[in-house]
């Protein structure tokens, strides 16, 4: 289905159930969590919930709203996915996903560890309120790295493509999605009386225990410990990345009238960044458990540059001077990052591409512009490790291939709008990628759940599946429709290398970082279609 020219979803739609290569070299796999599937099925924990389609906020009609391609509907539904992955206390009056309820309500009270989860690191007597935030994927861990990347990407899209959000009537949904994440980041940030960072929680949940279950989070009773980085157990990547998330969000909220909240976010962002820069180290060396899920392959210099670039903008948006932060970002980029690997892209682990685009926008630096354009040209032309399928998908990695394409699409849109768009190549890359994801591909199938034709029926997602291990491989559609979720997509540079099966966590899992660039790119496409 697609959205009509008046920009309003019909009730039938709403309630149907139906050039040069430089270091660092990217890792082969930067994967979301690998689920542990027992050989023998176990008894499901939860009863099968009813099939209920959540209502979608109608898109306002009028000037600029008539994009006949369905970008608005796809954007609406993307926010429903974020709501389906919320943890914490869900307000019954505003919860649009009726098969989701309160969960993770003991987060922060099942033990807080500074560093690895062992007896020596347990902080006796420390109890925190870590409710809220987002589950990272189709399971129930809460991880700082993908959350930080997700929030900064969503905020960036709201800043860069505000007219797209206005045209589709989704600005309020964007602000709500970002705030659900930033409220949690504020809880995860431990400070002293002077506002200096003392610790930052980088993971909540016993992920191995969670992976042994196939059940909705509402029914789970396993312990959910919290692991934090400190000065002695540093995590510059996760803290600088979270500073970037808070700084970018502060700009978004300031632009939309929430001045006091924006000021609070900026204060926390600056404190986290000072901590990240002073106590340097990879968080995955301090909390080794995350190495199996979200290892810091790229190190922390990329997040330090990215965080400083966002802080420069945030300080200026608040009426201050961002010069020192911008010089810091430039120094880190030029000296420590050195350039961009053209066959890779922005993702939860590698923020160097985002840093480069921000600095190219804000400084016009010729070398950085050359880096960005060399990278984007590789994606346009299919060179330097970027493969192009017969249907036009740019492919670099089997695990969540569409996430990488969508992330590049969003940054291509940002760069096209703000710096240069040679012969329209970058904006065409962005819109073509989104059109491919939404169904303009050789499979004639949408990769966004609940949107368009032949969309995924069995995304790898515990709560949406509505079954336990006994039904895990039943081949039936999920009981609950996970509206708006972007699945991983083709696992090879082949348009048909995709199977809609629940057990395929490489091609059919979903994740909050998968949808982040996708959401921004949708807003870009909607903005272009609306004439802005």
Give the role of each language-model region:
Residues 77, 81, 168-169, 184:
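Long, compositionally biased, intrinsically disordered segments
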Residues 177-195:
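Carboxylate/His-rich catalytic cores and anion/metal-binding grooves
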Residues 156-180, 222-230, 248-266:
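Short coil/linker segments at helix-helix boundaries
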Residues 77, 180, 264, 268-271, ...:
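A non-catalytic, amphipathic alpha-helix used as a structural packing/dimerization or gating element
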Residues 59-153, 157, 202-241, 245, ...:
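Aromatic (Trp/Tyr) and acidic
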Residues 285-296, 342-346, 388-398:
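Acidic, Ser/Thr-rich low-complexity linear motifs
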Residues 1-65:
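Long, low-complexity, Gly/Thr
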Residues 270-274, 281:
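Hydrophobic, small-residue-rich alpha-helical packing segments that form membrane-like cores
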């Amino acid at each position: 289905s697609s959205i009509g020219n008046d920009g309003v979803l019909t009730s039938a739609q709403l309630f149907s159930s139906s050039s040069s290569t430089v270091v660092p070299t990217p890792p082969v796999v930067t994967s979301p969590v690998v689920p542990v599937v027992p050989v023998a099925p176990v008894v499901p924990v939860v009863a099968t919930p009813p099939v209920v389609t959540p209502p979608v906020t109608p898109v306002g009609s009028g000037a600029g709203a008539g994009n006949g391609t369905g970008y608005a509907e796809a954007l609406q539904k993307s926010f429903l996915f974020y709501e389906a992955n919320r943890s914490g206390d869900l307000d019954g009056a505003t919860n649009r996903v009726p098969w989701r309820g309160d969960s993770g309500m003991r987060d922060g009270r099942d033990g807080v560890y500074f560093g690895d989860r062992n007896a020596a690191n347990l902080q006796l007597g420390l109890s925190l309120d870590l409710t809220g935030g987002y589950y990272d994927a189709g399971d129930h861990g809460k991880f700082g790295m993908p959350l930080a990347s997700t929030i900064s990407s969503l905020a960036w899209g709201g800043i860069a493509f505000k007219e797209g959000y206005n045209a589709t009537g989704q600005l309020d949904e964007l602000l709500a999605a970002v705030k659900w994440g930033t409220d949690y980041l504020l809880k995860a940030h431990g400070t002293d009386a002077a506002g200096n960072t003392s610790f930052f929680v980088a993971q909540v949940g016993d992920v191995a225990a969670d992976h042994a279950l196939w059940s909705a989070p509402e029914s789970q009773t396993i312990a959910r410990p919290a692991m934090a980085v400190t000065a002695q157990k540093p995590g510059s990547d996760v803290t600088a990345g979270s500073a970037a998330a808070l700084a970018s969000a502060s700009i978004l909220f300031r632009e939309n009238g929430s001045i006091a909240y924006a000021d609070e976010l900026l204060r926390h962002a600056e404190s986290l960044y000072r901590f990240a820069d002073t106590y340097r180290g990879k968080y995955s060396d301090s909390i080794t458990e995350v190495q199996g899920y979200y290892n810091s392959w790229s190190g922390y210099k990329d997040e330090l540059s990215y965080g400083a670039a966002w802080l420069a903008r945030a300080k200026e948006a608040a009426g201050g001077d961002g010069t020192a932060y911008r010089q810091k970002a430039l120094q880190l980029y030029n000296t420590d990052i050195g350039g961009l690997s053209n066959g890779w892209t922005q993702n939860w682990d590698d923020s160097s591409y985002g840093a480069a685009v921000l600095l190219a926008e804000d400084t016009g630096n010729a070398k950085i512009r050359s880096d960005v354009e060399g990278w984007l040209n590789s994606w346009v032309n299919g060179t330097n490790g970027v493969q192009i399928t017969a249907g036009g998908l740019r492919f670099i990695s089997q695990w969540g291939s569409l996430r990488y394409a969508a992330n590049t699409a969003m940054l291509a849109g940002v760069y096209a709008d703000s710096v240069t768009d040679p012969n329209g190549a970058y904006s065409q890359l962005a819109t073509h990628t989104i059109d491919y994801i939404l169904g303009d591909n050789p499979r004639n199938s949408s990769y966004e759940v609940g949107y368009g034709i032949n969309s995924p029926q069995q995304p790898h997602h515990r709560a949406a599946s509505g079954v336990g291990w006994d039904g895990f491989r039943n081949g039936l559609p999920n009981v609950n429709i996970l509206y708006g979720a972007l699945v991983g997509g083709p696992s090879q540079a082949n348009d048909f290398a995709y199977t809609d099966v629940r057990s395929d966590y490489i091609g059919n899992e979903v994740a909050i970082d998968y949808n982040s660039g996708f959401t921004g790119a949708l807003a870009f496409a909607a903005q272009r279609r609306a004439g802005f």
